């Protein structure tokens, strides 16, 4: 899943209004933010195999540190604890941790059985939604659209940066996702990894746009 993860970050603002959207994006995408580092270091591996699923051409050979269930729980606890140590807000810390773990849950839905339960384990799981174009698109659009609606219902723009900066972010994510659907397989693993590294820039973009928005209070 891709934009569905960002939908989780948008929606989380409703239950953690004090938390920056940038932090929520970092949490919801943290496993994918780690993954390209491990690819470049040769610790985790992926194979480009067009046709392995109808949607994604990637054969995730092994990625136990970034994407096994056990490590997803560990990363969730680490980020939640770090947030609490910095902000002393227990509820928001739990939301940050839950956003991290939500990434594995959504990946479990779309991936073929390639997600390990723990590093070194032989069992691999995944429901394989990527084997259906229509189901994948429906799930992505629903998660992203619902998250976007929730975020817009609980925040309001304070200025043009908060209005257009946020919509530019949403458009970048949506059309970037569409481009990956129709662009075909990436030219190589290194290019794929550097493209993943570039996605780190989305977190500060989210922080900046969110800093120009205010919590919308019902009257």
Task: Describe these PLM feature segments.
Residues 1-219:
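N-terminal membrane-targeting hydrophobic helices
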């Amino acid at each position: 899943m891709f934009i569905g993860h960002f939908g989780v970050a948008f929606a989380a603002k409703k239950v953690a209004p004090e938390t920056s959207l940038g932090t929520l994006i970092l949490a919801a995408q943290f496993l994918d933010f780690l993954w390209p580092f491990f690819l470049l270091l040769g610790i985790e591996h992926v194979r480009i195999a067009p046709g392995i699923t109808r949607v994604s051409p990637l054969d995730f050979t092994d990625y136990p540190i970034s994407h096994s269930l056990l490590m997803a729980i560990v990363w969730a606890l680490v980020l939640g604890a770090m947030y609490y140590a910095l902000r002393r807000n227990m509820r928001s810390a739990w939301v940050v941790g839950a956003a991290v773990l939500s990434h594995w849950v959504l990946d479990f839905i779309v991936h073929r059985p390639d997600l390990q339960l723990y590093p070194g384990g032989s069992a691999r799981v995944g429901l394989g939604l990527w084997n259906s174009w229509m189901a994948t698109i429906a799930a992505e659009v629903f998660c992203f659209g619902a998250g976007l609606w929730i975020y817009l219902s609980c925040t309001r723009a304070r200025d043009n940066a908060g209005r257009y900066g946020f919509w530019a972010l949403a458009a970048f994510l949506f059309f970037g996702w569409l481009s990956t659907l129709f662009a075909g397989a990436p030219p190589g693993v290194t290019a794929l990894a550097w493209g993943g590294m570039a996605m780190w820039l989305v977190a500060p973009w989210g922080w900046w746009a969110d800093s120009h928005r205010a919590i919308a209070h019902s009257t």
